[in-house]
Amino acid sequence: MTRKNTTTNPWAKFHGPNLGYVIEQYDLYVTGAGSVDPELQELFEIFGAPSFQDDVVTGDNTATHFSPQNTGNIEKILKVVQLVEQIRSFGHTLAHINPMEDAANGQSLLEKAMNELSDADLKAIPAKTVWQDAPEGIHTALDVIHRLKEVYTQSLAYEFSHIQDSEERAWLHQMVESNSLRQPLSNKKRTALLKRLTAVEGFEQFLHKTFVGQKRFSIEGVDMLVPVLDEIVLEGAKNGVEDVMIGMAHRGRLSVLAHVLEKPYSHMFAEFKHAKIEGAVANSGWTGDVKYHLGREQVVSNEEVSTRVTLANNPSHLEFVNPVVEGFARAAQENRKKSGLPEQDTSKSFVILVHGDAAFPGQGIVSETLNLSRLNAYQTGGTIHVIANNAVGFTTDSYDSRSTKYSSDLAKGFDIPIVHVNADDPEACLAAANLAIQYRMLFKKDFLIDLIGYRRYGHNEMDDPAVTQPQVYKKIKNHPTVRAIYADQLQAAGVLNADEIETITQFTQEQLKSDYAQVPPADTSDATIHVKVPDVVAKGIQPIDTGVELDSLRAINEGLLSWPEGFNVYPKVKKILERRKDALEENGKIEWALAESLAFASILQEGTPIRLTGQDSQRGTFAHRHIVLHDTDTNETYSPLHRLPNINASFSVHNSPLSEAAVVGYEYGYNVFAPETLVMWEAQYGDFSNTAQALFDQYVSAGRAKWGQKSGLVLLLPHGYEGQGPEHSSARPERFLQLAAENNWTVANLTSAAQYFHILRRQASILGTEAVRPLVLMTPKSLLRHPLTLSTANQLSEGRFQPALEQENLGTKPNKVKRLVLSTGKMAIDLAAEIESGRHEYNLDEIHIVRIEQLYPFPAEKVQSIIKRFKNLEEIIWVQEEPRNMGAWHYMAPILFELAGDKVKTGYIGRPDRSSPSGGDPFAHKAEQELIVSHALDVKYNFRQDKLEIEVFSN
């Protein structure tokens, strides 16, 4: 028996989905058709059926009393509640967001659900029963449905139901449903928007007519991209943002440069004419790049605010700019002028990434970069993504380019709110932009705008798109531009008349003609066809003393071996660290990891910040670094490099996600924007670095030559043949050497801890100078603790990095030396170890060994001076552990031929050509390695072929 209590009505606090749930539970309670929560059962016993009594004001202003349990409307209320949620979640399926398609045809599940309820049913239900925050003027459920359909199924469509944070989801729905986003624009802003669209369209059409057939990758069809970027930049500036970073591909790039980044039309036209124009700022390197790859930096302002906007240089490798720009932003956000971790302020900058609709789901670098968005080492406080969606990728339709309904669907997996907007509705586009920037600034998370338009011409302007998309291009040919559509709307609304609209058009045309008239004729002088490397680059890195006083090194080492009282270091790690205690004393030896830590500390003390990332960089892949300690009881972390005295620069070391491409791009971008920082990326094994090959090819090796974009990024690539198979042996040095030219980077493979110490300090010393360049290091694995790679304290406190080293105790009788062996890295240590072992007898008087520590630029003068000492030299041999078609041989061969001259033979000893870098059998590997070593040291071997074992040949 229900004990009806009339003094209190607990149901009054239930609304919408919550009320629907309680009503559904009461139905189960009454019918006994299912289990009901005990607490609800008690409420039902005390208070009876859930009720909501209200006066329902209908369209004719008459009021009726409504009570669900009295009218038997429980099922209808549930359907309305479900319908409201379906509109919120699936309204996008009915929205008119594609200007090339008609509105949805009403066959969706959502439309069917709407048809199950009559207007009379909906009028009988009070609005607040199903929508607690129903705005003023919304009285019935019918009003609710009409209002929500207006919000969710027009030219703006929203996907928020996948957002896991309920606070964020509620905020998004409230922003949309309160209609604050769609407040009418002032006539002044509407006129300004039309002027902007007229400028964008006029610029593109002027290029089309003036430079017939030249590629420009027109923005036409998604013209609203420019005002959308304007709005985001302006609103960001109002929020105090100092830097806005933009990454985008070539589609629409020229218009963005001209309008958002204010590149003068005359400078754009000069690039098309191949003319020199006064005042043009060179933003390219000595080889340059095509105009639609170039970036720009510009302070953008209006009468109220200003901010710096950077459009990143970009190759045609779509989407690879994404992590680069994220690195820009993180660098701009961090204060690196104090010891410890950098201090990050995400309100100082943010990123806008403009994607293609085919590239966003198609390129894996997109998901790699999205995965960085909430990681401590990489998050930038939210990126605004804009898909410039023209529904076709070159000639490929969307049904052939993605497996999802929308090109934006990938973003759902990363909890990113999505707004689809019709690019032919300018004011809706601005509303989307406004929501995006507000969300980013409030929640510090990513947001995506799917700007759906079309492509008026082919992939480029010489391409005929009707060949592959004949039907849609019939539509596009007759479809008015967004400028024309908006001009008609403003004229119909009485904002502007026809004459005023024509005046705006004529003003744009006159401006374009005037700027074009400023451009001189094409420059056809010989100077324009000669590419000259700047002298400061051509002369390379000059010798730099990088030693550190011994007392300073000892003080640093003491600090490195200290940790807070009560901090429990893992016993095995503690033992490793304690072995380093006497390393800098008279008879001590310094291993690789300690040399690195000493270098880091000394660099920090000189005011240079350091950032190191990689998949296992805190500990080190080979358990050697231990630069971050973990308390065994609390898992609290501690890095001694954060507590050393006399440091006024930050140090950060992060374990990265299992990604190479995105992380390399990010670190490159960070370094470009923070040129004073020693930024290092470490591969888990060098073999895996090739998944970032596009970044090495397009950015790290060529960025300065193409764009004048300097970088001092350090790549640490573990390399060495130790019988671990083809996936854990080779960093493929041949690829980095193939890319080496014009002093674009340094490639090194070192043989001692001291050399590593000095090259790191040398690299730090050139940061922020014209001499700066990336450093590619083939780092050791088994050599990390090898006795022959250990160094003394004096070797760190004195001298500098040596590009070539001579093997000690060889070449002491110059007139007897017949064979000069050149090698690098682990191969050189294997040769030294064989000599030291004394296991075999060799005529060592007739041999000399030189370790090439710096492969590129090759230390020709040093090696030539060594060769001149040996008057009876007969042969110069390059010895390597990699197969002949890999490693350094093909890079070294022409160098050796030139060094040897006509009278001295040159030769190769190593494995023969192979398709795989290494074999999988450790015993076969060991046998091959022993043959290489013995043949290299046996002067009597005298060049023969043995394809089954190793390959030896001469010229």
Curated annotation (Swiss-Prot):
Give the intrachain disulfide bonds.
none
Catalytic activity of the protein: N(6)-[(R)-lipoyl]-L-lysyl-[protein] + 2-oxoglutarate + H(+) = N(6)-[(R)-S(8)-succinyldihydrolipoyl]-L-lysyl-[protein] + CO2
Q: What class of enzyme is it?
A: oxidoreductase
The highest taxon in the source lineage is Bacteria
Keyword Oxidoreductase set for record = yes
- Name the GO terms of the biological process aspect: glycolytic process; tricarboxylic acid cycle
Assigned keywords, A-Z: Glycolysis, Oxidoreductase, Thiamine pyrophosphate
User: Under the cellular component aspect of Gene Ontology, which terms does the record hold?
Assistant: cytosol; oxoglutarate dehydrogenase complex
Q: Read off the SMART domains from this record.
A: Transket_pyr
Cofactor(s), names only, from the UniProt record: thiamine diphosphate
State the EC number(s).
Answer: 1.2.4.2
Record-linked Gene3D superfamilies = 3.40.50.12470, 3.40.50.970, Multifunctional 2-oxoglutarate metabolism enzyme, C-terminal domain (3.40.50.11610)
Q: Which SUPFAM superfamilies match?
A: Thiamin diphosphate-binding fold (THDP-binding) (SSF52518)
Enumerate the Pfam families for this protein. E1_dh (PF00676), OxoGdeHyase_C (PF16870), Transket_pyr (PF02779)
UniProt-listed InterPro entries: 2oxoglutarate_DH_E1 (IPR011603), 2oxoglutarate_DH_E1_bac (IPR023784), DH_E1 (IPR001017), KGD_C_sf (IPR042179), ODO-1/KGD_C (IPR031717), THDP-binding (IPR029061), Transketolase-like_Pyr-bd (IPR005475)
Entry's Gene Ontology molecular function annotations: oxoglutarate dehydrogenase (succinyl-transferring) activity; thiamine pyrophosphate binding
Which HAMAP family did the record assign?
SucA_OdhA
Q: Which family does it belong to?
A: Belongs to the alpha-ketoglutarate dehydrogenase family.
What the protein does comes down to: E1 component of the 2-oxoglutarate dehydrogenase (OGDH) complex which catalyzes the decarboxylation of 2-oxoglutarate, the first step in the conversion of 2-oxoglutarate to succinyl-CoA and CO(2).
- What is the protein's quaternary organization? Homodimer. Part of the 2-oxoglutarate dehydrogenase (OGDH) complex composed of E1 (2-oxoglutarate dehydrogenase), E2 (dihydrolipoamide succinyltransferase) and E3 (dihydrolipoamide dehydrogenase); the complex contains multiple copies of the three enzymatic components (E1, E2 and E3).
State what protein this is by name: 2-oxoglutarate dehydrogenase E1 component
User: Organism, per UniProt?
Assistant: Bacillus anthracis
Query: What gene is this protein a product of?
Result: odhA
